[in-house]
């Protein structure tokens, strides 16, 4: 199943167990297949630091569920305290991103900094042969190296959130569920008699309740709510806001302005503490920059213009575009057709069909258009 260089009965596999059905089923499949499996669960945050809610990844109930499954499978299980690291690398960056007028993507930063860095290094310290997760994405060995591909189940594909995985990390990571559908995963979970077989999927941001991200920001950084101006993109002042952390690009509701036509958040100027609003038509654009490119395609970096498909939000479909190398790991992206609400701080993930070529972070515009 994992195509390792050692025989499965001699291989030690660390499974990142979140307490959900996906990672629990992976652990069960590998145990049944004859591997020596070790379950690891990360404790990521204090409930008094973030906003607690049910259905959150790596919360108290999830740790209990992971340990219960490990006992059922009769595999070793450890809980690692990564709360400080998670706060430093994910929550603090999440807060700063909103303060800077961006729309952050903490799940990618968690994969990038905690799961595939700290946890991966811990697995290596255990002299494990691989770190395995329950992500829906495919890792394919080819003559040209290891490739990352979209999952077979397009509805559950998580490749967008894994674009920052490096080539060296892919040498050690494996994703057995990439060739399964979610229904197949639940079937196997029931077959193994796992008590979490019908457990709902975790939500996107584990430490935010009901999408109220501004409550987390305000709780951990109370001075982040500074009043400022709401300005129409044509230049005139419409009113006052109570903090740019309450806004994101493309937002229509809860702007707090009465106007003859629907208003949307078009841009956020963090330096001037101004929220720019305007008609929906102003949300569409074809050209933007991405920074901190992680390249998974041929060679070490994008070196010439390339026709690709890109996703600018996890919920968006991939659209055709052309990449132009710029400088310092920056790339200009020109879309074939305009896309709506391209938000700084979100990821732009690059594809060629099902192949993940990498991605980067959408950069803020230098000037107000």
From Swiss-Prot:
An example Gene Ontology molecular-function term: tRNA-uridine 2-sulfurtransferase activity
Family annotation (CDD domains): MnmA_TRMU-like
Catalysed reactions listed for this entry: S-sulfanyl-L-cysteinyl-[protein] + uridine(34) in tRNA + AH2 + ATP = 2-thiouridine(34) in tRNA + L-cysteinyl-[protein] + A + AMP + diphosphate + H(+)
EC number: 2.8.1.13
Binding site for ATP: 16-23, 42, 134
Signal peptide annotation: none
Sequence segments annotated as region (Interaction with tRNA): 156-158
Active-site feature positions: 110 (nucleophile), 206 (cysteine persulfide intermediate)
A single Gene Ontology CC term: cytoplasm
GO biological process: tRNA wobble position uridine thiolation
Chief place where the protein resides: cytoplasm
Protein family (similarity comment): Belongs to the MnmA/TRMU family.
HAMAP family: tRNA_thiouridyl_MnmA (MF_00144)
Protein's recorded name: tRNA-specific 2-thiouridylase MnmA
Organism expressing this protein natively: Orientia tsutsugamushi (strain Boryong) (Rickettsia tsutsugamushi)
């Amino acid at each position: 199943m994992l195509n390792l260089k050692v025989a499965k009965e001699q291989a030690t596999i660390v499974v990142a167990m979140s307490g959900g059905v996906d990672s629990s089923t992976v652990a069960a499949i590998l145990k049944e297949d004859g591997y020596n499996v070790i379950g690891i669960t990360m404790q990521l945050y204090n409930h008094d630091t973030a906003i607690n809610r049910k259905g959150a990844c790596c919360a108290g109930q999830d740790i209990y569920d992971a340990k219960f499954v490990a006992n059922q499978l009769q595999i070793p299980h450890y809980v690692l305290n990564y709360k400080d690291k998670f706060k430093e690398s994910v929550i603090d960056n999440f807060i700063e991103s909103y303060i800077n007028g961006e729309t952050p993507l903490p799940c990618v930063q968690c994969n990038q900094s905690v799961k595939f860095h700290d946890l991966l290094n811990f697995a290596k310290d255990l002299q494990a042969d691989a770190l395995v997760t329950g992500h829906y994405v495919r890792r394919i060995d080819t003559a040209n190296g290891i490739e990352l591909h979209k999952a077979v189940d397009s509805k559950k594909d998580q490749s967008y959130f894994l674009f920052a995985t490096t080539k060296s990390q892919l040498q050690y990571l494996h994703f057995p569920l990439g060739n399964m559908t979610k229904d197949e995963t639940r079937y196997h979970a029931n077959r193994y008699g796992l008590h979490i077989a019908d457990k709902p999927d975790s939500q996107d941001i584990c430490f935010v309740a009901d999408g109220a991200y501004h409550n987390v920001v305000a709780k951990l950084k109370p001075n982040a709510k500074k009043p400022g101006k709401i300005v129409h993109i044509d230049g005139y002042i419409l009113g006052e806001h109570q903090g740019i952390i309450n806004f994101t690009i493309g937002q229509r509701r809860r702007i707090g302005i009465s106007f003859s036509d629907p208003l949307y958040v078009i841009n956020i100027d963090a330096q001037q503490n101004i929220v720019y609003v305007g008609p929906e038509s102003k949300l569409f654009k074809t050209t933007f920059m991405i920074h901190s490119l992680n390249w998974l395609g041929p060679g070490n970096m994008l070196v010439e213009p390339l026709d690709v498909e890109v996703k600018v939000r996890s919920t968006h479909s991939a659209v055709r575009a052309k990449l132009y190398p710029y400088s310092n790991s920056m790339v200009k992206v020109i879309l074939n057709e305009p896309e709506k609400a391209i938000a700084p701080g979100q990821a732009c993930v690059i594809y060629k069909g099902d192949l993940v070529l990498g991605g980067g972070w959408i950069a803020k515009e230098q000037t107000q258009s």
